Amino acid sequence: MARIETEKMSQLLQVYFIMGSNNCHKGPLQVMKEALDGGITLFQFREKGEGALTGEKRVQFAKQLQALCREYRVPFIVNDDVDLALKLDADGVHVGQDDEGIEVVREKMGDKIVGVSAHTIEEAHFAIANGADYLGIGPIFPTNTKKDTKAVQGLNGLRYFREKGINIPIVGIGGITIENASSVIEAGADGVSVISAISLASSAFDSAKAFVHQVKK
């Protein structure tokens, strides 16, 4: 199997939904199904923070979400945990700068999707040189979902990466809503990653569908 083509990766990033059980008010499996019905293009399992599942419960929950993704042919990515990604035969993994080194991750994951969070041009170049398939850039806007975020980059921060020749697929992260999603694409991102704007929406289906419309218009 060869690594994913750039054009295909770019398409998958369009509406990238990230969720764990503690990101929902409603049943997470219901939220997930609604989001898939609404047209999300990629999913990341991120079971972290207060109230998150651990141990075997976490693994079983991941398997349930993965089964839904397979049903809809939406790739299933695991946040940070390479061992879990391998155990589940996930489609890929997303790592931050504080996680296991990108070189080691690429070696372990083979040709599967590897995404890396980058906050500087140097981090971006290092990730690309060591096998990243896409970069997560952000936070673009202020966010309350993640407690350990870096300084807000803004749309100008996103543009800066493109101006400096970073040409692999990029997904914007942080504080992205239906109202500002199109501006993230215009600033140079291939897609938007979303947690609460879908997971906490009164209708995850309607929200996901609206994001698809904003990103693809």
UniProtKB/Swiss-Prot annotation:
Keyword Ligase attached: no
Single Gene Ontology MF annotation? magnesium ion binding
Q: Which keywords label this protein?
A: Magnesium, Metal-binding, Thiamine biosynthesis, Transferase
Q: Where does 4-amino-2-methyl-5-(diphosphooxymethyl)pyrimidine bind?
A: 44-48, 79, 117, 146
Keyword Transferase in annotation: yes
Swiss-Prot/TrEMBL cofactor(s): Mg(2+)
- Which Gene Ontology cellular-component terms appear in the entry? cytoplasm
The pathway this protein participates in, as annotated, is:
Cofactor biosynthesis; thiamine diphosphate biosynthesis; thiamine phosphate from 4-amino-2-methyl-5-diphosphomethylpyrimidine and 4-methyl-5-(2-phosphoethyl)-thiazole: step 1/1
Where along the chain is Mg(2+) bound?
A: 80, 99
Which residue windows are coiled coil?
none
Q: What is its EC number?
A: 2.5.1.3
According to the record, cofactor stoichiometry and binding are noted as: Binds 1 Mg(2+) ion per subunit.
What Pfam families does the entry give?
Answer: TMP-TENI
Instruction: Report which reactions are catalysed by this protein.
Output: 2-[(2R,5Z)-2-carboxy-4-methylthiazol-5(2H)-ylidene]ethyl phosphate + 4-amino-2-methyl-5-(diphosphooxymethyl)pyrimidine + 2 H(+) = thiamine phosphate + CO2 + diphosphate; 2-(2-carboxy-4-methylthiazol-5-yl)ethyl phosphate + 4-amino-2-methyl-5-(diphosphooxymethyl)pyrimidine + 2 H(+) = thiamine phosphate + CO2 + diphosphate; 4-methyl-5-(2-phosphooxyethyl)-thiazole + 4-amino-2-methyl-5-(diphosphooxymethyl)pyrimidine + H(+) = thiamine phosphate + diphosphate
Binding of 2-[(2R,5Z)-2-carboxy-4-methylthiazol-5(2H)-ylidene]ethyl phosphate: at which residues?
143-145, 175, 195-196
* Superkingdom, taxonomy of origin: Bacteria
* Role description: Condenses 4-methyl-5-(beta-hydroxyethyl)thiazole monophosphate (THZ-P) and 2-methyl-4-amino-5-hydroxymethyl pyrimidine pyrophosphate (HMP-PP) to form thiamine monophosphate (TMP).
What's this protein's family per the entry? Belongs to the thiamine-phosphate synthase family.
What NCBIfam families does the database record attribute to this sequence?
thiE
User: What is this protein's name?
Assistant: Thiamine-phosphate synthase
- Which species expresses this protein natively? Bacillus cytotoxicus (strain DSM 22905 / CIP 110041 / 391-98 / NVH 391-98)
